[in-house]
């Protein structure tokens, strides 16, 4: 399955809209987009998962790595548009306490 990825550069953050299934086969596509953003370290990153129908632990691992890299530059990762099902992954793993995870598509 292919992953649909749209990126928008705002003045103070990058917005990444993701659609499809985020798993071991598709995470490398998203990683190609996120790695340069986290290496640059000049903007927060907002990842919108509203159109993601499935995500496994590989996706969680990518977000943990992105968060760590951004935090080194005093920047943050915001995971937005999280469905109830995907939200449970963040809850069960305790990652919801470490990063900004929101069911809405805007940063609160």
Curated annotation (Swiss-Prot):
- SUPFAM superfamilies, alphabetically? SpoIIaa-like
Q: Which residues carry this modification: Phosphoserine?
A: 57
Q: Which Pfam families match?
A: STAS
Q: What CDD domains does the database record attribute to this sequence?
A: STAS_anti-anti-sigma_factors (cd07043)
What InterPro entries does this protein's entry cite? Anti-sigma_ant, STAS_dom, STAS_dom_sf
* Domain STAS span(s) in chain numbering: 3-108
A molecular function (GO) held by this record is: anti-sigma factor antagonist activity
Q: What does this protein do?
A: Positive regulator of sigma-B activity. Non-phosphorylated RsbV binds to RsbW, preventing its association with sigma-B. When phosphorylated, releases RsbW, which is then free to complex with and inactivate sigma-B.
The family note in this entry says: Belongs to the anti-sigma-factor antagonist family.
Name of the protein: Anti-sigma-B factor antagonist
Q: Which organism is it from?
A: Staphylococcus epidermidis (strain ATCC 35984 / DSM 28319 / BCRC 17069 / CCUG 31568 / BM 3577 / RP62A)
Encoded by which gene?
A: rsbV
């Amino acid at each position: 399955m292919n992953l649909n990825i749209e990126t928008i550069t705002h003045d103070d953050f990058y917005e990444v809209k993701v659609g499809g299934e985020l798993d071991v086969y598709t995470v490398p596509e998203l990683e190609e987009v996120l790695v340069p953003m986290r290496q640059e370290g000049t903007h927060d990153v907002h990842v919108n998962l509203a159109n993601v129908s499935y995500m496994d632990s590989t996706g969680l691992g990518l977000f943990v790595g992105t968060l760590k890299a951004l935090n080194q530059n005093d920047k943050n990762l915001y995971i937005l548009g999280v469905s109830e099902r995907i939200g449970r992954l963040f809850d069960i793993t305790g990652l919801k306490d470490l990063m900004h995870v929101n069911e809405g598509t805007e940063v609160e």
